[in-house]
């Protein structure tokens, strides 16, 4: 992903892990109280406390995505959770593994951008019917104005989003024409 200020060094992800309960209890490791991303935070928290870790190529977890999963559900506080997600990770590594902070921050910035893109998608396509056009426009405007999001919100990075009307819409957000696009989308979906 392109960053206007600096290039990220890594993008990361976890699948599944087995944990020792005594480490969880002793170190008081907890999940974040958010709906999306709480599992990776738990995993990082655990790994920073563990003395050893074993990896395998064997698939022990199958992540199922469908339209009823949390991945696609609308959450009215998704943007706030994204900010909490970012600051929690940053604080964790700042406190427990400062020598990795630049490495982690680069990956977190990419993840923050992707979650903001997801927040726009949720606002457009998964918001409840009682959510007004004005509310949707305000939320998308708040995301667009976010400084950290703007660092990565480039036309070059838009090519990493799925082709189709969502990418077209993101281009309209980029050139600040999203208000009319939300109104048009509302009219199309209400027919």
Each model region followed by its residue ranges:
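Donor-binding/catalytic cores of nucleotide-activated saccharide
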Residues: 1-56, 61-79
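Glycine-centered secondary-structure boundary/capping sites
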Residues: 8-9, 97, 101-102, 176
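Short charge-dense sequence patches
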Residues: 30-43, 86-91, 170-179
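Secondary-structure boundary/capping signal
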Residues: 51-54, 101, 151
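Catalytic core of nucleotide-sugar-dependent glycosyltransferases
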Residues: 58-67, 73-100, 115-149
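All-alpha amphipathic helical-bundle segments outside canonical DNA-binding/catalytic cores
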Residues: 101-110
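Membrane-interface aromatic/basic loop that binds lipid-linked glycans or pyrophosphate carriers
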Residues: 125-191
């Amino acid at each position: 992903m392109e960053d206007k200020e600096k290039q990220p060094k890594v993008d990361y992800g976890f699948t599944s892990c087995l944990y020792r309960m005594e480490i969880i209890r002793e170190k008081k490791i907890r999940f974040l109280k958010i709906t999306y991303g709480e599992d990776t935070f738990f995993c990082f928290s655990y790994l920073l406390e563990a003395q050893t870790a074993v990896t395998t190529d064997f698939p022990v977890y199958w992540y199922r995505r469908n339209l009823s999963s949390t991945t696609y559900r609308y959450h009215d506080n998704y943007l706030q959770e994204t900010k909490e997600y970012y600051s929690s990770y940053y604080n964790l590594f700042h406190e427990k593994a400062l020598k990795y902070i630049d490495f982690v921050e680069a990956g977190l910035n990419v993840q923050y951008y992707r979650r903001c893109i997801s927040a726009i998608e949720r606002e457009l396509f998964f918001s409840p019917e009682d959510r007004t056009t004005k509310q949707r426009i305000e939320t998308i405007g708040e995301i667009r104005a976010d400084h950290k999001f703007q660092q990565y919100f480039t036309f070059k990075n838009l090519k990493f989003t799925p082709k189709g009307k969502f990418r077209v819409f993101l281009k309209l957000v980029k050139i600040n024409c999203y208000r009319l696009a939300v109104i048009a989308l509302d009219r199309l979906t209400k027919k």
